[in-house]
Amino acid sequence: MNNAANDGYGERYYRVLHAANDLKYFSVKIKESDLAIAVDRKSYSDSLLSLCQRELLGVRRQLEDYIKRHPEFMTSFVPLPLMVGAPEIACRMAAAAEKAGVGPMAAVAGAIAQSLGQALENQVQEVMVENGGDIYLLSKNDRVIAIFAGSSPFTYKIGIRVEPEESPLGICTSSATVGPSISLGRADAAVIKAYPAELADAV
């Protein structure tokens, strides 16, 4: 199920509408992972890009190595027990999957977003990491997250307000009509707020 070519999602066109002037935006991409990252302008430095690249490469390598040992982790639609020596990211995904009653890969985008966000927290005051519609947010200011729902008339007309005391927080979107991810539902956009981000993603 991949309609990215005709829904504007493949190039992440919705990202050009980022409107928080107090944040500095940059992106990191490795293989399937294509992340938009925002930090407060006072904290930004070019070194953050390298930090994010290293963190993304590291978590991907850990997960890929684990999947080589446990291929079912990649394909299962139901929760799975972990093999001995599973990396932290696989453990977090499996825990979220167990709570949601889904396969562990349902939590992968949120888990990666949170991994990068937490890697930045000691370097910045505020951070937002968006990974294919799944967001990890740590903010000291009110934020409104606009909902992208493809060709739906509600696209960009609905937003979710997040107050500082709610963060850190995961805000994750699932869609049956937008993007390459497998969806067993029918909604143009179903949005969940939860912590950690991998739980919001899995649900």
Report the location of each language-model feature.
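Short, charge-rich amphipathic segments
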Residues: 1, 40-56, 133-141, 156
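Short, Gly/Pro- and small/polar-rich lid/capping loops
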Residues: 1-16
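Alpha/propeptide regions of enzymes that mature by internal proteolysis
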Residues: 2-4, 45-129, 193-203
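Short, solvent-exposed secondary-structure boundary motifs
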Residues: 15-20, 126-127
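Glycine-rich anion/phosphate-binding loop at the beta-strand->alpha-helix junction
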Residues: 98-178, 183, 193
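A structural signal for small-residue-enriched, beta-sheet-centric alpha/beta enzyme cores
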Residues: 11, 20-49, 67, 80-81, ...
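Arginine residue identity/basic-tract feature
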Residues: 12-15, 41, 54, 60-61, ...
